[in-house]
Amino acid sequence: MEQFQEKVNELFAKHETLLSRKNIPLEDGNGIFTRYQHPVLTAAHTPIFWRYDLNEKTNPYLMERIGMNATMNSGAIKWNDKYILMVRVEGSDRKSFFAVAESPNGVDNFRFWDYPVTCLLYTSDAADEL
């Protein structure tokens, strides 16, 4: 139990280090765009609880259950004084879903919302109620 919890704490600590890492502008640029040292969002930014079953009884070896392969094709807006990305997240199985990540400055500290984007499916009966 104790060793499992230590591993979970280590996962969260490493993840927090990644999320809170300062993204430094690179010196060599063309004067039009500013390039940065790190990508603003990667598969490693996805929440730990999306990737791991954190229950020791059902995942005693703390194996990653849902592998993330990439984050891509983001659309960005500034909303409520935050920078919001609608991101296509690709799993290791190459199946994709959409998720929202936000940052206070648009350069670093991007954090995914707790849940991916879901769509409500309307049947003709449900549409009649609208």
Predicted region positions:
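N-terminal regions that are enriched for targeting/export leaders
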Residues: 1-74
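Hydrophobic core segments of beta-strands in well-ordered, beta-rich domains
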Residues: 74-91
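Single conserved hydrophobic/aromatic residue that forms the stacking wall/gate
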Residues: 122-130
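Short, solvent-exposed loop/turn segments at secondary-structure junctions
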Residues: 46-47, 90-93
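Short coil/turn motifs at helix boundaries and re-entrant loops, enriched in small/polar
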Residues: 48-49, 64, 107, 116-117, ...
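Beta-propeller blade signature
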Residues: 99-106
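A detector of repeated loop/turn-to-beta-strand junctions in beta-rich toroidal repeat architectures
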Residues: 95-97
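Beta-propeller fold detector
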Residues: 37-40, 111-118
